[in-house]
Amino acid sequence: VCNAGIAAQKLFTDVTDEEWRRMLDVHLSGAFYCCRRALPHMIHQKWGRILTVSSMWGQVGGSCEVAYSAAKAGLIGLTKALAKEEGPSGVTVNCVAPGVIDTDMMASFSAEDKAALAEETPLGALGTPKQVADALVFLAGDGAGYITGQVLGVNGGLVT
C-alpha cells in the first residue's frame, strides 16, 4: 500500500521549486520506489496486490492545491499504467481516492471549516480513516481479483 502523503494549501504562483519537488517526491516518487521494490517478489509468485492512495483532487483538481493535485493525478496514472503492465503477471494495481477524511492533515482546519466541508458532502459527514482502510482491505482481498487499474472514490459522494 503506497500511502505516503503531505499537503499544502497555497496559490500556484506561491509554490516554490523545493515545495513542488517535495510534493512529487513524497507522493509519486515514493510510490514508484515502493512498487519497484515489491514487484519482483509479486511477479515471482505470480500474484500480488498493489494499492495506491490518491485523492479526489487527483481526479478533479483542487484550487490552491495544484502541486498536491498534480502529484495525486500522477499517482492515478502510475496505477493505471502499472495495472496494464503487470496484469499478465497476476498482479492487480488499484487506487483509492479519498475525499475529505478526518485525519491529521485536517488539523489546521477549524471546527466551522470541517462542519462546512461535511455539509458539502452528499452523505453529510467527513470520512474516517477506517472507511478508507475498509476500501483498501477489499481491494487487497480475493474478492477483488478481477479488478485492476481502477480508482475507487471514498468521498461520500462529493466527487462522482
Write out the residue ranges for each language-model feature:
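Active-site loop immediately N-terminal to the catalytic Tyr-X3-Lys motif
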Residues: 10-13, 60-66, 88-89, 124, ...
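Residue(s) in the substrate-gating loop at a strand-loop-helix junction
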Residues: 55
